[in-house]
Amino acid sequence: MSRTIFCTFLQREAEGQDFQLYPGELGKRIYNEISKEAWAQWQHKQTMLINEKKLNMMNVEHRKLLEQEMINFLFEGKDVHIEGYTPEEKK
């Protein structure tokens, strides 16, 4: 049975995560406040960010950068800036 939460990213009720996806207090906050739909949007942005900036997840500084971008995107309403990327226009 799925959980319904108020997603702070989407600003509406949505299906919550099945389990905590990220460690620590930030992971608890994501579990309680971020829906599956919002998390999928973040994963798409995260993949683009890792590829475009050639981030190495073995590098602590790169992981810190990615975590800060995640916080900015999910909780502070800031979009991820990827140089040279222009989003498709919605019709």
Swiss-Prot record:
A GO MF label: iron ion binding
Organism expressing this protein natively: Citrobacter koseri (strain ATCC BAA-895 / CDC 4225-83 / SGSC4696)
Gene3D superfamilies in the cross-refs: Fe(II) trafficking protein YggX (1.10.3880.10)
The protein's name: Probable Fe(2+)-trafficking protein
GO BP term (any one): cellular response to oxidative stress
Entry-linked Pfam families: Iron_traffic (PF04362)
Main function: Could be a mediator in iron transactions between iron acquisition and iron-requiring processes, such as synthesis and/or repair of Fe-S clusters in biosynthetic enzymes.
Oligomer and partners: Monomer.
Gene Ontology, cellular component aspect: cytosol
InterPro entries: Fe_traffick_prot_YggX, Fe_traffick_prot_YggX_sf
Alphabetical UniProt keywords: Iron
Family: Belongs to the Fe(2+)-trafficking protein family.
Lineage: Bacteria, Pseudomonadati, Pseudomonadota, Gammaproteobacteria, Enterobacterales
